[in-house]
């Protein structure tokens, strides 16, 4: 099992910091069965923090790149406590911002973590915004080796996260405009400001919406799985961390 993991997390209005998806890899030549999760009840997840694949009964997604299995799940049964500790730290950081600016933290408990936050406008959310972040975790106690890996692949990793975030924001903007056809196409601040102008109706009841609904893309988490797998494979191919 690789020491490098990519997570997508969300600050849920109802549950606080929650992991939406985790992408990990297993040993080359195996099926990665230990990373799959069993069928589990989803009642403890609200609509905002639920991982939603096109087939509702699907709980895990797996692909192979050069015979290495990459698995995406709602949570990691192996790193459950670790990743929950990481997202709580990430969302509680005073430096946490949501304009795609990365920040890094490292300690012996959580390893090295690169966090990039972003937000999407949603009038049905508290504060009219939903907050997310992608996190690259290097689960290693070697600060020097982890930083070396990160510095060597900095532009690639940051660029990879930026591309996925830009895709999510763009299709979210298209979905928003599709439902608000009378709004002028001048929404550069759509996902950067919590307040979006006087044409939006206030005092609506708040309810949960996940990324599939916000983007109107039922294959979004499939795309995230494939993109994260590509990022992990590229980084892993050149680095072997203890």
Curated annotation (Swiss-Prot):
Protein name as annotated: Protein LST7
Free-text function comment from the UniProt entry: Required for the nitrogen-regulated transport of amino acid permeases GAP1 and PUT4 from the Golgi to the cell surface.
Record InterPro entries: FLCN/SMCR8_DENN (IPR037521), Folliculin (IPR021713), Folliculin/SMCR8_longin (IPR037520)
Origin: domain of life: Eukaryota
BP term (GO), one: positive regulation of TORC1 signaling
Coiled-coil ranges (or none): none
Any one Gene Ontology molecular-function term assigned to this protein's record: GTPase activator activity
Cited PANTHER family: FOLLICULIN, FOLLICULIN FAMILY MEMBER
Signal peptide range in chain numbering: none
Changes seen on gene knockout: Sensitive to high hydrostatic pressure (mechanical stress).
Domain uDENN FLCN/SMCR8-type as annotated: residue spans: 48-212
One GO location term (cellular component): cytosol
Other facts noted in the record for this chain: Present with 656 molecules/cell in log phase SD medium.
